[in-house]
Regions:
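Conserved acetyl-CoA-binding loop-helix of GNAT-fold acetyltransferases
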Residues: 98-115, 131-139
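Conserved beta-strand-loop-alpha-helix junction that forms the acyl-donor binding cleft
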Residues: 124-134, 152
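GNAT-family acyltransferases
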Residues: 1-95, 108, 112, 116, ...
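Conserved GNAT acetyl-CoA-binding A-motif
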Residues: 116-125
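A generic structural signal for short
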Residues: 81, 98, 121-122
Length: 176
């Protein structure tokens, strides 16, 4: 599968690849956040898979407020056909949370995944106690799929949410 990452735009956000000049803004997100390691991960993702997290910038101010993108694209193991499933993740800096930016970005990423990459399914995970992240997934149109036990994922129990391309296309979410 050949992937090509494009810039995305929403009502309030411009989304693009991360670059070295983003380091100081990324470092301000959280005191413990390792901006250098994150940006190296981004460069590796773009180089190896032509895909990675999009930087989320407010159109109004140009402020870098978070990231959203695919952390994995793999065969969809829920079917016996050769189809692709994308797993999404997102992060919004604390001072920008609660404004719907993650949901807005996620919907744009999902549209790109279904329309440009031709994914058949998109899924996202969250810890059961992370109610805000669960709301982002729900507000973006994903439905609860199942619990993933710690033994399966290698991390604490997680709630898996998913949406199929057909369900996305039938919803109002597929419209920009």
């Amino acid at each position: 599968m050949l992937l090509k990452m494009s810039d995305l735009e929403t009502e309030r956000l411009r989304m693009r690849e991360f670059c070295s000049s983003d380091a100081s803004a990324v470092a301000r997100w959280e005191p413990s956040f390792r901006a250098d390691a994150f940006l190296e991960f981004c460069r590796h993702s773009y180089r190896e898979w032509s895909m990675g997290p999009w930087a989320m910038l407010l159109k109004e101010s140009g402020s870098l407020v978070g990231n959203c993108g695919f952390c994995r694209i793999d065969y969809d193991r829920s079917t016996d056909k050769l189809e692709y499933c994308g797993e999404v993740n997102y992060y919004v800096a604390p001072q920008y949370r609660g404004a719907g930016l993650a949901t807005e970005a996620l919907r744009s990423v999902m549209r790109f995944g279904f329309e440009e990459i031709r994914l058949t399914r998109i899924q996202g995970r969250c810890a059961p106690e992370n109610v805000a992240s669960e709301h982002v997934l729900q507000n973006a149109g994903l439905k609860f799929d199942r619990m993933i036990a710690a033994a399966q994922s290698g991390s604490p129990d997680e709630r898996l949410y998913a949406i199929s391309r057909e369900d996305f296309q039938c919803s109002t979410l597929s419209k920009p």
